[in-house]
Amino acid sequence: MNSKKLCCICVLFSLLAGCASESSIDEKKKKAQVTQSNINKNTPQQLTDKDLFGNETTLAVSEEDIQAALDGDEFRVPLNSPVILVQSGNRAPETIMQEEMRKYYTVSTFSGIPDRQKPLTCNKNKDKNENEDVASAENMNWMQALRFVAAKGHQKAIIVYQDMLQTGKYDSALKSTVWSDYKNDKLTDAISLRYLVRFTLVDVATGEWATWSPVNYEYKVLPPLPDKNEASTTDMTEQQIMQLKQKTYKAMVKDLVNRYQ
C-alpha cells in the first residue's frame, strides 16, 4: 500500500470519528439519553432546591454561620407591596392563587419552568480560563437571575410555591392511609385527596429567604350521584379538586400575610 492511499484512509477515519471516538457503549448511552430527553419533554420541569437556594443546601456550614443567620434582621413584606409570584412547573400560577394574592399584594407573575443550560460540546475554547467558567457556573442559579429581574422591576419580594396533589387510600394492614401522587386516576369514595404546598419567600434586596409548608387539608372523595354519566362524574371530581385548592390557597395566603406583613 503506497503512502497516498494510507494518508487518505487516515483522513477518512478521522472524519468519521468526529471530535471524539465512541464505542458501542457510548452509542447505547446516547440512545438512552435521547429516550430520557423525550420523556422529560412531556413532563413539565419543576424547580429544584438548587434553583431556589443555589449551593446553600450543600455548603459546609459552621456554627458561626448559623449564629450569624439567627442575628440577621427579619424581613417584612408590607401589604400592597409589589411581588413576583411563581408556581413551580407552570408558565404562570393558577388563576385562583393569583386572585387570592392580589387581595393583599401587587402581583406580577413569572414562569416556574427553569431554562436548563445546554450540555458542553467538544468545540471548546481553549483560550478561555476554565477556572472562571467553573466559578461562574457555581455562582449562577435561577433565583439569582430572578432577583435581578425583580430588582429591575422594583419588586419587594419573590414568592415561589411548589405544589403536589395526592390521593390516599386506607391500608388495613398498615392501619394508616398510604399516599401517592395524583395522575388523573379514576377516583372512588374510598379515596382521599390532599394538596401539599411549600412556600419560599425571598427578599429581593438582600437575598434572605424563608421557606415553610402550611398545614394541609384532606378531603374524602364524594361518591358519584346515581344515574350520572361518566362526564358528570369527571366534572364532580374536578370541582372537588378545585375546592380543595381554593381552600388551601386561601389559608396559605392568610398565613403568609400574618407572618410577614
From Swiss-Prot:
Membrane topology label: Lipid-anchor
Record lipid sites (N-palmitoyl cysteine): C19
Lipid attachment residues per UniProt (S-diacylglycerol cysteine): C19
Compartments in which it is found: Cell membrane
Top-level taxonomic group: Bacteria
Key words, A-Z: Cell membrane, Lipoprotein, Membrane, Palmitate, Signal
Signal peptide: 1-18
GO CC annotations on file: plasma membrane
Protein name, UniProt field: Uncharacterized lipoprotein YafT
Source species of the chain: Escherichia coli (strain K12)
Taxonomic lineage: Bacteria, Pseudomonadati, Pseudomonadota, Gammaproteobacteria, Enterobacterales
